[in-house]
Amino acid sequence: MTFESSSAYDIPQLQPTEFVPANLAAWNMPRHREYAAISGGALHFFLDDYRFETVWSSPERLFDRVKAVGASLTPDFSIWVDMPRAAQVWNVYRARWCGAFWQSQGIEVLPTACWSTPDTFDFCFDGIPDGGTVAISSMGIRSSKADQALFRAGIQELINRKQPQLLLAYGRLRYCDDIDLPEVREYPTFWDRRRKQVSDSWEDGAAKAVPDQGPEPATSAAQEPVELDLEA
């Protein structure tokens, strides 16, 4: 099955959408998917590639999982620095193909952008609609200045080439303080949610462990400071 493309690599062109998900649910988490299905959310693939390889290898068999939610980001197949160029192009092609297939079946689809070194810029943004919404994530960016610089360069190139009106960031969008960004909407990661759950649970437990002390007693007149006349 092939889809319309203006790319030199025949990477499928996605259609624009105004849909903005209320939340993002991981492809491999059933309860998160169930919540997304009833709350206007969308699937995301900011996971290890092996966890969602089957969206490409068995698209029809796994389509019901996408259909149950009704909206999805495109798969985030990795583009590693040390990958052969052919493999990098292949992963971009697969990601857009899945998105185009889902769109053909009535699913709301938002493109996920990823990149590697600047020599990937000639193809890694192919198929992303101009002036639309694009999903990204700075998760996994290592602390080295070189990695952070590559991430910033990709963000700037995405803006220059596609002029997105909205960026959907999985997790806090870091390393971009010096870039003139469009509107950004950040979504909590799985670990953000877990930390909040643990924190809320601890606070609830602490409140139950400490008995109610009642209202704070008023300060009596005897407890008020007395000014002494030292010159008497």
Positions of PLM-derived features:
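Basic, amphipathic N-terminal segments that precede the first structured/catalytic domain
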Residues: 1-46
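C-terminal accessory extensions appended to soluble enzyme cores
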Residues: 1-19, 181-232
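Eukaryote-skewed repeat-based solenoidal scaffolds used as protein-protein interaction platforms
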Residues: 31-35, 39, 43, 53-201
